[in-house]
């Protein structure tokens, strides 16, 4: 069920004095923002509410929560939201069907989309990956962790039909794996921490291991971007500020993350919260500009999405997906970089 709340946050006097003034910040403009609950990639949106950054940017943030990516991007077709953060697969789907544009990368989830095994099995499988032939692999098909499975199998010199692939939702995988079902479980965060802490599971192969990058996308409706480029720049600058702030205020960020996850009904250990930060590389403004630079050809981000799009086309999730250059744009990043106030805000200066 779609849950909605309006959050503009409270501004402490010290924050107001420290932050650079936002253009036309005296009058708030409504901005409809979509995210998913208890997901690290969405955390900067929650953090901005707690820190009062939306108001500093002149934004009245109306935040909608969606349970998953597909209904989230489908709602964009009805103009239910203007900007948001979603997974890489929904972002490609949204680009293909609803003209969503990717304007940034919230984080890299390659280390948290993982094939996991029981600790006692790890050494044997690594020594002889062919021992997985005929074994049951529990996976949520046509998702990013399935994309990771495909790439990990390639490194093992195995084909998909060499295994018994069992399609289950993430909660079902945890339940089945805990009772001894399956040799391999494909999981993503925060489920990987449950498997590690309660079942003694360990990573066998991640997206990072197999060269399958799994970003999380900062997106906007194409029409809204065309009509409101300044508002989109303020939004992205605020998200980038959250990324920069989290890097330099780790302990305070951990406390805020706990409140965000609790709001979504997710409880994990303190060690898991720390792992969320450690295993999710994030990118500030300058890193974004380098990752999305096309001056010498396709950007690094373009190359990430070429592999994912090919997989989504192969499994039928997105037929003939558009080229990354069609829906990934650095125009908003460049707008921020060229505006001294927005640049300073994005850099948490």
PLM features: residue spans?
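N-terminal export leaders
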Residues: 1-7
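Bacterial N-terminal signal peptides
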Residues: 7-18
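Sec/Tat signal peptide C-region and signal peptidase I cleavage site
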Residues: 19-25
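Short, glycine-/small- and polar/acidic-enriched structural segments
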Residues: 26-169, 176, 183-189, 204-206, ...
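Soluble non-cytosolic domains of exported or imported proteins
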Residues: 66-70, 85, 139, 143-144, ...
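Pocket-lining segment of extracytoplasmic ligand-binding domains
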Residues: 121, 172-269
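Secondary-structure end/capping motifs
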Residues: 228-319
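Conserved C-terminal helix/tail region of periplasmic/extracytoplasmic solute-binding proteins
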Residues: 305-349
């Amino acid at each position: 069920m779609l849950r909605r709340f309006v959050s503009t946050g409270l501004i402490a006097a010290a924050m107001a004095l420290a932050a650079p003034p936002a253009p036309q910040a005296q009058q708030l403009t409504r901005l409809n923002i979509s995210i998913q609950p208890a997901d690290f990639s969405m955390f900067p949106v929650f953090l901005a509410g707690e820190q009062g950054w939306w108001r500093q940017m002149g934004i009245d943030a109306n935040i909608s929560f969606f349970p998953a990516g597909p209904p989230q991007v489908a709602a964009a077709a009805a103009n239910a939201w203007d900007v948001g953060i979603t997974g890489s697969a929904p972002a490609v789907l949204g680009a293909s069907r609803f003209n969503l544009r990717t304007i940034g990368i919230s984080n890299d989830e390659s280390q948290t989309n993982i094939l996991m095994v029981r600790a006692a099995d790890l050494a044997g499988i690594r020594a002889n990956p062919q021992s997985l032939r005929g074994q049951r692999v529990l996976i949520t098909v046509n998702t990013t962790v399935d994309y990771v499975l495909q790439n990990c199998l390639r490194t093992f010199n195995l084909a998909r039909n060499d295994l018994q692939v069992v399609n289950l939702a993430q909660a079902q995988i945890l339940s089945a794996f805990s009772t001894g079902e399956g040799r391999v479980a494909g999981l993503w965060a925060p489920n990987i921490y449950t498997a590690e802490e309660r079942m003694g599971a360990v990573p066998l192969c991640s997206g990072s291991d197999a060269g399958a990058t799994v970003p999380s996308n900062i997106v906007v409706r194409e029409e809204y971007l065309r009509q409101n480029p300044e508002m989109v720049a303020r939004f992205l600058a605020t998200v980038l500020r959250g990324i920069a702030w989290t890097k330099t205020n780790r302990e305070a960020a951990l406390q805020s993350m706990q409140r965000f996850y609790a709001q979504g009904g997710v409880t994990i250990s303190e060690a898991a919260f720390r792992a969320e930060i450690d295993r999710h590389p994030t990118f500030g403004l300058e890193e974004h500009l380098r990752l999305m630079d096309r001056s010498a050809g396709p950007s690094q981000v373009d190359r990430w999405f070429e592999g994912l799009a090919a997989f989504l086309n192969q499994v039928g999730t997105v037929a003939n997906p558009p080229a990354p250059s069609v829906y990934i744009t650095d125009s908003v990043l460049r707008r921020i970089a060229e505006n001294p106030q927005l640049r300073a805000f994005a850099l948490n200066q």
